[in-house]
């Protein structure tokens, strides 16, 4: 059964150094098919932070699909922000801003929602990006599980308002739902969340899962550090949350939920 280790908002520059080694060990134990990192590898897009992120990714023995977050775009270096906002990301992490991972049983498509503007960290998608991703999802053979990875979320927990949604979410969801998207992975809020798209978008016959990872940084905003592990088949998806245990200095399984594919989508 394909397995995904999903982490987000590592924020090298503000990473909790005690957590890095146990995190690597946890990923090793899970032995995922691939690792999804939904953005914000750095705190301020500095060279030293990208180098630390690169070293961390190089320690993972599994394929990695990573997309940029708003913190991976320079904030104070205005020349870089205006002229080449993804330059350092491409230099140290990867050239591709919207990578794809594909196997016989799943396809995962990354979408870059990080923007040089506005300055407050909001993200958005444009029609060209979404159409390209939708076409890739549609073209996948043998009806795999279809996954979309962004930094900014398509849905938010009840504690957050709609202003935190990814920009142009209605347009994007409509087209990605038509392409058969099953799972949306994101981060940004530093809050763990699992739900389904039918609550917000109400697209007939479509209900995908929205899965948000917490953070690995010291910017936990009241929540302990977490990662997600997804175990997927065409009819069943299990999502397990691993939470940092301060006393044991390990990540422990803290929550599991199972969803099944129905005629109306995933519930």
Where are these regions (language model features)?
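N-terminal active-site segment of His-dependent metallophosphoesterases
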Residues: 1-59, 75-76, 132, 138-142
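Active-site neighborhood of phospho(di)ester-bond hydrolases with catalytic His/Asp-centered motifs
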Residues: 7-8, 35-40, 64-70, 112, ...
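Active-site environment of divalent metal-dependent phosphoester hydrolases
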Residues: 13-16, 43-48, 70-78, 115-120, ...
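Residues at alpha-helix caps and immediate loop-helix transition turns in enzyme cores, especially N-
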Residues: 16-20, 48-50, 129, 161, ...
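Extended active-site neighborhood of metal-dependent phosphoesterases/phosphodiesterases
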Residues: 51-132, 140, 175, 202-205, ...
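Short acidic, glycine-rich surface-loop motifs adjacent to enzyme active sites
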Residues: 141-157
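Conserved beta-sheet core of the metallophosphoesterase superfamily
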Residues: 161-235
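A short C-terminal boundary segment appended to hydrolase-like catalytic domains
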Residues: 231-267
């Amino acid at each position: 059964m394909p397995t995904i280790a999903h982490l987000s908002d590592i924020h090298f520059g503000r990473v909790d150094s005690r957590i890095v080694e146990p995190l690597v060990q946890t990923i090793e134990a899970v032995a995922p098919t691939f690792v999804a990192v939904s953005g914000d590898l750095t705190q301020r897009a500095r060279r030293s932070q990208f180098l630390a992120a690169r070293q961390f990714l190089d320690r993972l023995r599994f394929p990695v699909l990573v997309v940029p977050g708003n913190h991976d775009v320079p904030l104070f270096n205005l020349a870089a922000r205006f002229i080449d906002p993804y330059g350092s990301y491409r230099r140290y992490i990867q050239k591709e801003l919207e990578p794809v991972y594909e196997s016989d049983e799943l396809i995962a498509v990354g979408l870059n929602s990080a923007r040089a503007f506005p300055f407050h960290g909001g993200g958005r998608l444009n029609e060209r990006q979404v159409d390209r991703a939708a076409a890739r999802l549609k073209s996948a053979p043998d009806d795999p599980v279809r996954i979309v990875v962004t930094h900014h979320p398509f849905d938010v927990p009840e504690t957050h308002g709609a202003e935190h949604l990814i920009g142009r979410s209605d347009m994007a969801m409509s087209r990605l739902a038509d392409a058969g998207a099953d799972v949306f992975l994101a981060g940004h809020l530093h809050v763990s969340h699992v739900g389904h798209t039918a609550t917000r978008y109400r697209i007939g016959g479509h209900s995908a899962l929205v899965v948000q990872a917490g953070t690995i940084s010291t910017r936990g905003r009241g929540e302990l550090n977490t990662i997600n592990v997804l175990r997927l088949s065409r009819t069943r998806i299990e999502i397990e949350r691993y939470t940092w245990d301060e006393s044991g200095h390990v990540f422990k399984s803290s929550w599991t939920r199972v969803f099944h594919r129905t005629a109306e989508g995933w519930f």
